[in-house]
């Protein structure tokens, strides 16, 4: 990877065209913009309406956590004194400084991004919160946006709320098909503005489970430079990679090899590796974009919870980066075993009735139901929502992951929570539902052998 100091960083003014009209018109919070000045030595602040910490009833917070190196061992961590006071008080919009500092170090260690090189980090109430704000500060109503298809269902309403024109980029088992993306951009009408953003989940994509290969990532980055768009890299399953090959570099890391740096806005989540309910995620990317997101935060929810950030920092600081790495490796191995159990049941019950590709990261199987002799036909909606549910199993029909809707024979199934016996029962019930529909369609069980190895998008 090229030395970061040899790379040209896009200037702040470059991002003016990527900031939405609403974000440009948003008036900054007069109080929050001045809060950093309270820390200037000698300044007596009469600025903020902060409650006096002496009135808070909490005096100490202790919690126990498993050791990342020995899960049978626990340690008790305590937050009190000035640490607790900071956790109970209003804090900086971008985040709790000790945690921000820790995250800066993490992004340096994992992605090769050094602090002070034109990028910053902001905390959010989960990565979903940050994605919502990023879209709103970058996209104007009616804009065309590039989204991989199938796509994470949680972003579709965000784009729909802005009446966006969702341009579907084809994917397969290797991630975004760069040939599809190139065709879209090269054939774009000359009288219409090109999309400013591309949304993608490169590791263990939700719903497909696909992980983008290194070659595909490089091709997408090249197209981002050629056609001038920002990659929204939503990577909640980055730490849940369990493939046989070494983990591919992120877009955030790979862009250091580009002639210019600053076309990736990255979203990380602690939900899958520490706690979903603690609601903490962080965004890393160009300062101009993160500052616009911070302005949105300052006039909406003000900040991410200081207390949850203080708890997370206390834990991570006690672990060190090495302990964090060990913990995430343990989590990814846990889900690899879950994947294998689920796939074993699929081979047992769905051979000849479904097609799938084995995921290398994440929590999901994405499989195609063979509901009729014509394998290109079929709609999983009735099979899953009605037939399968009547038999006692819930899964999600694939239509909910298509940016512009429509029938599809695909289904998403999560394997994160279910034990081995329930997995066996659930997949057997899906088999029974498929057979019921095939009988209505006048076909029986397919006997041509296992089909799971094919890329089936």
Provide a role label for each language-model segment:
Residues 2-98, 105, 390-393:
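N-terminal "arm"/small-domain region of PLP-dependent enzymes with the aminotransferase-like
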Residues 45-48, 168, 199-202, 232-235, ...:
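Short beta-strand segments
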Residues 52-59, 206-209, 239-242, 274-276, ...:
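Short catalytic/ligand-binding loop motif for oxyanion handling, primarily in non-cytosolic enzymes
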Residues 69-228, 232, 238-259, 265-269, ...:
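Conserved core of the PLP fold type I
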Residues 116-118, 358-364, 406-408:
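Short Gly/Ser/Thr- and Asp/Glu-enriched loop/turn motifs at secondary-structure junctions
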Residues 256-336:
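Conserved core segment of the aminotransferase class I/II
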Residues 285, 366-376, 393-428, 433:
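Conserved PLP-binding active-site segment of the aspartate aminotransferase-like
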Residues 328-343, 353-372:
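Conserved glycine-rich beta-strand-loop-beta hairpin in the small C-terminal domain of fold type I
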């Amino acid at each position: 990877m090229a030395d970061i100091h040899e790379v040209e960083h896009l200037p702040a003014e470059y991002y003016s065209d990527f900031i939405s009209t609403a974000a440009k018109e948003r008036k900054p919070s007069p109080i929050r913009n001045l809060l950093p000045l309270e820390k200037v030595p000698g300044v007596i602040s009469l600025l903020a309406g902060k409650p006096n910490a002496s009135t808070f009833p909490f005096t100490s917070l202790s919690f126990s956590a498993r050791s990342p190196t020995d899960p049978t061992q626990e340690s008790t961590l305590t937050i009190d004194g000035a640490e607790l006071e900071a956790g109970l008080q209003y804090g900086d919009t971008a985040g709790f400084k000790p945690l921000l500092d820790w995250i800066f170090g993490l992004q340096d260690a994992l992605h090769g991004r050094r602090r002070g090189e034109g990028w910053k980090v902001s905390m959010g109430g989960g990565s979903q919160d940050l994605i919502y704000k990023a879209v709103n500060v970058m996209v104007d109503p009616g804009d065309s946006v590039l989204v991989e298809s199938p796509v994470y269902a949680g972003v579709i309403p965000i784009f729909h709320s802005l009446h966006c024109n969702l341009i579907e980029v084809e994917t397969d088992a290797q991630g975004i098909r760069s040939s599809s993306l190139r065709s879209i951009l090269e054939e774009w009408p000359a009288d219409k503005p090109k999309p400013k953003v591309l949304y993608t989940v490169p590791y263990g994509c939700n719903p497909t489970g696909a992980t983008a290969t290194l070659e595909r990532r490089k091709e997408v980055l090249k197209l981002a430079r050629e056609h001038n768009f920002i990659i929204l890299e939503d990577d909640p399953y980055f730490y849940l990679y369990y493939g046989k090959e070494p983990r591919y570099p992120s877009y955030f890391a790979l862009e250091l090899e580009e002639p210019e740096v600053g076309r990736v806005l990255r979203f990380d989540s602690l939900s899958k590796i520490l706690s979903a309910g603690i609601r903490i995620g962080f965004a890393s990317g160009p300062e101009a974009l993160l500052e616009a997101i911070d302005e949105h935060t300052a006039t909406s929810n003000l900040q991410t919870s200081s207390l949850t950030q203080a708890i997370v920092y206390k834990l991570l600081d006690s672990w060190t980066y090495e302990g964090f790495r060990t913990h995430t490796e343990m989590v990814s191995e846990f889900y690899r075993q879950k994947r294998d159990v689920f796939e074993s049941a699929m081979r047992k019950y769905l051979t000849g009735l479904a097609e799938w590709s084995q995921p290398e990261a994440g929590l999901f199987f994405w499989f195609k139901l063979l509901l009729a002799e014509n394998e290109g036909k079929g709609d999983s909606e009735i099979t899953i929502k009605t037939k399968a549910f009547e038999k006692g199993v819930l899964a999600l029909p694939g239509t909910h992951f298509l940016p512009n809707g429509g029938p599809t024979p695909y289904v998403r199934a999560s394997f994160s929570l279910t034990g081995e016996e329930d997995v066996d029962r659930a997949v057997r019930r899906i088999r029974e539902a498929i057979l019921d529909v095939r009988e209505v369609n006048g076909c029986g069980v397919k006997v041509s052998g296992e089909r799971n190895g094919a890329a089936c998008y």
